[in-house]
Amino acid sequence: MPEPTAASYRFFSWLRQGLLAGLSNQAGASPPLTNGHLVLPIRLRVNGAAPVDVNIQRYGPGDITGIDAREVIRTEPQAHMTDFEPNYFPAIEFDRPDFPWLFTPAKADAARRLHPWICLIVVRKEGAALSTVPRQPLPVLTCGQEELPDLDQSWAWAHAQIVSGQTASPNPTLQQILKDHPDRTLSRLLGARRLDPNTAYYACLVPTYDVGRKAGLGEPITADDEQGLKPAWSQGPGAPTGTVSLPVYFHWEFRTGLAGDFESLARRLEPKQLPTTVGLRPMDIGQPGWGMPVLPPDAPGGLLDLGGALRTPETNPRPW
């Protein structure tokens, strides 16, 4: 009977399919933008007629005013959890393995990094407001600028996950898994912040481009906005301070528990110099009984050390 093949988890810093997959394999700069959309040249042939070269435009972040909630397959922690470990990162998972980069209007940079068009932000409920505004397509989060992560690092907090190793093929290709086993693929965003113990948080899925922010808030988008594709917010020296309003595609809330997980307990440990007798219990065999000879009180070998389960590197038991 053949042994079962163990599952193998493969992680990709980004993933694209279809026309965008071909775009990512091309060298050079990103294709031009028209009204904030990627312009891709394709060749069409209809019913055997002569081929026609045309340019197509893909949807961009400025076209998105909502997502299908069924795309979200899991959140960590679950909504309304009250004792989430503060040393863990919140996360959100999507059914499509390419979802975080689906509407990114660019290709990967020279370092093979691709920024997602969405990110997961986690902000403290105290000092933040999540509200529904009439005649606006999405809920609005208002919070302090200091609560938000650095979007220059958003590429590092997104990845795709592929599970392989349980198919008839010993080394299935990525294309095979995407086509034949979509249930083994997903994408994930992590919330880039360190959580505090016993604190309530909002976890919100928001756009990373300013055109996406304006589209979600129902604000007008100018031609300069579409061509510039500025980030939805900025961090670092010279960045604006104060509050920022962001449209929210998906959100939930949770609370962290008290500090008391393994990490916090391990951090409380303090190294101390221990004596060489740690882990030993003296055992007197000078009067064993049962007719065996009795040893004088000071005779060598009359006192032995019985070792325990724990000992230090310096523990030095008496020889038997």
Which residue stretches match the model-derived regions?
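Extracytoplasmic low-complexity repetitive segments enriched in small/polar residues
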Residues: P2-A27, P31-L33, V244, V248-Y249
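Solvent-exposed beta-strand/loop surfaces of large extracellular or lumenal domains
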Residues: P172-L178
